[in-house]
Amino acid sequence: MRGLQFLLVPAFCLSAFLSAPAQSCSGMSLGREASLNGFIPFPSDNAWNQDISSAPVDPNSSAIINFIGDSTPLHPDFGAGEYAGQTMGIPYDVVSGSPFVTINFTAYGSESDPGPMPIPKNAPIEGYPNPGSGDRHVLVLDRDNCWLYELYSSYPQKNGSWDAASAAVWDLLNDEQRPYTWTSADAAGLSVFAGLARYDEVASGAIQHALRFTLQNSENAFTPPASHWAGNSTDPYAAPMGMRMRLQASYDISSFPPQAQTILAALKKYGMIMADNGSSMFITGDPDNRWNNNDLATLKSVPASAFEVVLIDPLYTPTNVPTGPAPVIGSFTANPSTVSAGEPVTLSWNVSGASYFVVSPQVGAVRGSSVTITPTKSATYTLYGTNAYGRSTATVKVTVQ
């Protein structure tokens, strides 16, 4: 994507064909760490939202936890205020009418979803107000269209575009599997936002999804819902990306303070999914000054030995990654293909086997089989159709006289 012309697309040009169904995201509040007001990303059968409290235990559970370290404490990697000049946690921003801008890829563009994306120039970067050189995640939820946009190693540019090592788009209304062996804005190929412990949920009394966590060591393998590995250990009991752990049902959480108790209840019902290499047993949440840090600190009394590993099945390694056909694009057309500046053009496509679509430039992630644009200059549009086995593309040129 580096070198593409920068585009700012007014929201009114896109709303007619990008708007999400009425039952979706419209109730979200706007802004940083905004409340989703009960909206739960992704369908109820999505891996993040599944009740795994009765799922079978992996036969190697004890050995895996012993490798992690039985006494390794759970650690909330989020909270109120700042530490060393940085906020604690991964921020997110809920936007409406935000201009779509170009994303320039600096590392993993071949495994990323192309722009444009509605990333505000002042979107909070992980670690703000002094994000430094860490992971620098940027998470943006588009309330108008119900898409989630996630960037890794993100740097805003003076012209309004963003540089990022990688990026992924997520349809908040549907299940989406990234292509096997592809990364995302997270090492495991997962959504970062999906696994955050958010203050708005805890304040409501329940977290209704699994949490994201990290371990110091991982094997060169992944298990669903992950799609990517980042192995740094050959130990047979190192965890694969996507491994899920849950707090044992017998573990007494009744004496924990309210915020910690709500988090621990979620870890019993939904568990936590390994998403990246990092400090062991660190769970991720959003930075919010309404967190009670003393309350959250009680989570550190919970040892890894209080958890169990949910059955790892299937397990994918470089020798058995699933293969299959990428989407088949039968046609991608522009009608009309020659217009005067500002006149509408309908881009239409006939595709089989795709999980989601992106049209670039100007449009971004889109549902359905057509989109109407109002180009101001001649451009070649690219359709990207993606599924679990790869991505297919097609192009069409629109001439503006």
What are these language model-derived features?
Residues 343-347:
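Structural beta-strand segments of beta-rich domains
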Residues 7-16:
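Bacterial N-terminal signal peptides
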Residues 350-356:
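Short proline/glycine-enriched turn/loop motifs at strand-loop junctions of beta-rich domains
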Residues 364, 369-382, 388:
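Solvent-exposed segments in extracellular or luminal domains encompassing
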Residues 334-339:
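Short beta-strand segments of immunoglobulin-like
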Residues 18-22:
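Sec/Tat signal peptide C-region and signal peptidase I cleavage site
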Residues 392-400:
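C-terminal edge beta-strand
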Residues 23-324:
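Short, surface-exposed polybasic-aromatic patches that bind anionic ligands, especially phosphate groups
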